[in-house]
């Protein structure tokens, strides 16, 4: 079973988590579901190298915002790691275990529903941040690129629906 993770102060991740949690049962801090569980954490997801010590799951899916200086609208996903200096969480020169199957399935699902997201680029982003120390597969699923998209509950709900499908 997978654990979906959203950072409380990440508007896109938190919006996706709120939507997904509606059909789940709250058990302490964990929303329990049939196919995956969900937590909302109080610290940035890029620094969540600790998550595996506290939660035992087959893999980790981080729901998050995507930011880009270009301003290009994007729905993206990527595995985590740092090929050089760790400027955004994780450890220097460490790459986490990729969640290749989920990445492939999510991208195929996005492509199948591309008309619903016609103004967005659908991309695999380069690996560039933490967490990096996880030994189970992990992936970030992101909505970009500005606060307008991150706070668009309709968009976040649509992406969350696709996450639920995969």
PLM feature spans:
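N-terminal catalytic or cofactor-binding beta/alpha core of small enzyme domains
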Residues: 1-129, 133, 146-147, 153-157, ...
């Amino acid at each position: 079973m997978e654990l979906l993770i959203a950072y409380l102060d990440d508007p896109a991740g938190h919006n996706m988590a709120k939507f997904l949690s509606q059909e789940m049962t709250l058990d302490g801090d964990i929303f329990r579901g049939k196919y995956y569980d969900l937590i909302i954490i109080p610290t940035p997801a890029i620094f969540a190298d600790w998550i595996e010590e506290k939660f035992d799951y087959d893999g980790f899916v981080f729901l998050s915002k995507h930011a880009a200086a270009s301003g290009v609208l994007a729905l993206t996903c990527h595995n985590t790691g740092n090929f050089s200096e760790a400027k955004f969480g994780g450890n220097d020169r460490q790459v986490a275990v990729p969640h290749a199957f989920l990445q492939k399935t999510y991208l195929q699902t996005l492509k199948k529903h591309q008309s619903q997201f016609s103004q967005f680029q659908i991309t695999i982003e380069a690996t560039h941040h933490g967490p990096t120390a996880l030994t189970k597969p992990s992936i970030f699923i992101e909505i970009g690129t500005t606060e307008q998209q991150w706070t668009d509950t309709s968009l976040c709900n649509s992406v969350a629906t696709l996450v639920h499908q995969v």
